């Protein structure tokens, strides 16, 4: 290790110790907090279905940066490089459209065998897998309704797809020894004002109950449901609203997914974590960066990312909150996007772990809000960067922006050959 990194770390450790912060404990904790990286950044949410069509569901990947993965082998190769540039525990989040099969497979017929290569790869990488049914970009989602569709046959197709997805998720958990969190997000909604807001929600409620009727060991599989405010083409009404899924998660004992881009522009999910934790056992987070809408920009080390991490750590929720990322930017190098976003999430977690939380709470308990604010602000200028550099170095990961050269070299030698 570079002696300058060790020296800076030793000095930082002394400063944190003076505030009552155990840096070694913080690093040990960080090493074991997995962040679930999303596979769909690597190919702009295209997937590997034989009949893959245009991206639908009110979501968009904008840009045309060269070198996107064209098959599972290339996607895994790209992910491997990205993961070597990120310290600590990681997971991979897969969508159903990332199956591998020599023959076309209907979505309601997908099987664990179609994801066997992903499991084999995950074992090699020593990571867990998470999963999602893909209720978009399909002829039977063209009406903008899936699990809430008034046509019973179409609705049943999507119910069966979600059921099949749960079996795959449970297979992941059993094979890898770590529970797969399977998140159900549907694009169901309407462009203009509906005459009946209740009936689609009644259908969705019944459909979800059928989806989760088969029981699995929570050690292998955890169900999650995700709300959204609106999507393109569903501006006026979303069937799976925040209130719908909050009630569903609490009443059915499933996890609630909070996506940073799925609320009003001035709402933040960091404020929702503590409230939701009182009513649901598990929370799934989709950390993203909405720019004026659910644009899924690459995650920054900004105030909200930091606030999300801080809420998890302050409230001791690591065993109940599952951290996932959800962004897809096709205008920049896709591997760089993964690395930037995931490292930023890790940095936010480290900063939260290095916070003198007890001192803040003591000041608050005494109604000493001046000290509370002063300590919060002084914490921002503590030498957490020296600790981060040390974390990267001890994990054999590039320090600072040194990783960028590796990505640029890979772009020249590998990505540029993909036409």
Swiss-Prot record:
Cellular compartment(s): Cytoplasm
Keyword Coiled coil among UniProt keywords: no
Protein name in the entry: L-rhamnose isomerase
Domain of life of the organism encoding this protein: Bacteria
Organism for this UniProt entry: Tolumonas auensis (strain DSM 9187 / NBRC 110442 / TA 4)
EC number: 5.3.1.14
One annotated GO biological process: rhamnose catabolic process
HAMAP family: RhaA
Lineage, broadest ranks: Bacteria, Pseudomonadati, Pseudomonadota, Gammaproteobacteria, Aeromonadales
Function recorded in the entry: Catalyzes the interconversion of L-rhamnose and L-rhamnulose.
Primary location recorded for the protein, binned into one broad class: cytoplasm
Pathway(s) this gene product operates in, as recorded in its UniProt entry: Carbohydrate degradation; L-rhamnose degradation; glycerone phosphate from L-rhamnose: step 1/3
Similarity comment: family membership: Belongs to the rhamnose isomerase family.
Transmembrane segments: none
UniProt xrefs under Pfam families: RhaA
GO CC annotations, alphabetized: cytoplasm
Swiss-Prot/TrEMBL cofactor(s): Mn(2+)
Gene3D superfamilies: Divalent-metal-dependent TIM barrel enzymes
Entry binding sites for Mn(2+): 262, 294, 296
Catalytic activity of the protein: L-rhamnopyranose = L-rhamnulose
Single GO MF descriptor: L-rhamnose isomerase activity
Key words of the record: Cytoplasm, Isomerase, Manganese, Metal-binding, Rhamnose metabolism
């Amino acid at each position: 290790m570079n002696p300058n990194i060790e020296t800076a770390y030793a000095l930082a450790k002394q400063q944190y110790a003076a505030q009552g912060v155990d840096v070694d404990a913080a690093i040990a904790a960080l090493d074991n907090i997995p962040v679930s990286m999303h596979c769909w950044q690597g190919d702009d949410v295209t997937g590997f279905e034989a009949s893959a069509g245009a991206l639908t569901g009110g979501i968009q990947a904008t840009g045309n940066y060269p070198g996107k993965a064209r098959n599972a082998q290339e996607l895994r190769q790209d992910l491997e490089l990205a993961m070597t540039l990120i310290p600590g525990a990681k997971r991979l989040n897969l969508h159903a459209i990332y199956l591998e099969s020599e023959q076309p497979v209907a979505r309601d017929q997908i099987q664990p065998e179609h994801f066997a290569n992903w499991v084999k790869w995950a074992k090699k990488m020593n990571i867990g897998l998470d999963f999602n049914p893909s209720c978009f970009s399909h002829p039977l989602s063209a009406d903008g309704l899936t699990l809430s569709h008034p046509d019973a046959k179409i609705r049943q197709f999507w119910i069966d797809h979600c059921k099949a997805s749960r079996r795959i998720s449970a297979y992941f958990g059993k094979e890898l020894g770590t529970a797969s969190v399977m998140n159900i997000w549907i694009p169901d909604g309407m462009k203009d004002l509906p005459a009946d807001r209740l009936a689609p929600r009644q259908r969705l409620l019944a459909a979800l109950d059928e989806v989760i009727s088969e029981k699995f060991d929570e050690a292998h599989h955890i169900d999650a449901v995700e709300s959204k405010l609106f999507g393109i083409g569903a501006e006026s009404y979303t069937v799976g609203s925040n209130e719908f899924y909050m009630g569903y998660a609490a009443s059915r004992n499933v996890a609630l997914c909070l996506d940073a881009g799925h609320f009003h522009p001035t709402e933040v999910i960091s404020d929702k974590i503590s409230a939701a934790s009182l009513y649901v056992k598990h929370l799934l987070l989709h950390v993203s960066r909405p720019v004026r809408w659910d644009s899924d920009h690459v995650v920054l080390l900004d105030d909200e990312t930091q606030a999300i991490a801080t809420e998890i750590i302050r409230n001791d929720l690591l065993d109940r909150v599952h951290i996932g990322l959800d962004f897809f930017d096709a205008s920049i190098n896709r591997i760089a996007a993964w690395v930037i976003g995931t490292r930023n999430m890790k940095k936010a977690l480290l900063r939260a772990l290095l916070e003198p939380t007890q001192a803040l709470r003591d000041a608050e308990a005494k109604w000493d809000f001046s000290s509370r604010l002063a300590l919060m602000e002084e914490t921002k200028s503590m030498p957490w960067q020296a600790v981060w550099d040390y974390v990267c170095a001890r994990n054999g990961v590039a320090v600072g922006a040194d990783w960028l050269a590796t990505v640029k070299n890979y772009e020249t030698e590998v990505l540029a050959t993909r036409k």
